[in-house]
Amino acid sequence: MRYFKKIILVIIMTAFICLPVNAEMTLKELFFDESKPFHLKILDVIPEEGIIQIGDENANNTIIEFMDYFCGYCKKVHPELLQIASERKDTRIVFLQHPILSESSKLLANMVIAANMQNKGIDFHNALFEVEGNLNNAKLKQIIENLELNDAKLNIDMTKESVNNIVRLSSFLANGSGARGTPTFFVNEELVVGYISIDRIKALLK
């Protein structure tokens, strides 16, 4: 266990060295402040634009999913997560980018964060997982139109280095937390790697 914690420390310190992060969180607070659980401190590190979430940020339960938009199991679990969000008002669900499957995954991760800068991040996120069949340019364009996003601003923002850095940092934190693929979850303080059934998620809630 001590070795695992050292690995986490090395990886996340690398992220801090290489990437700009939330100035309100210091290394000392992240690793040595025991007043807050580690999974919640992850959310303090991610800049606001990178937080795609449903529910009250002060909710009693927090579910974090590291996910990829081309991950089949991420798509499978998504409606179950939305069901939990609907049924449990004491639970928030946070979706963090971990685009590992393709360059297209990285493109969509950037696009969702750019949409979040127009306050449409969660809507874009949900729409991507609700696409039937394969996602293509026509379907993507339709989502943008349906959400009434500023297409020009979206294209500019998604190429910004700050957006690239958010995605990189999120993946660093995923790897440092022990993610070996997608989806990977924190259900409160419990780390779960891989698909998890709705019943098991509910069993881990307070």
Model regions and ranges:
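Extracytoplasmic thiol/disulfide redox context detector
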Residues: 2-7, 16-100, 156-159, 163-176, ...
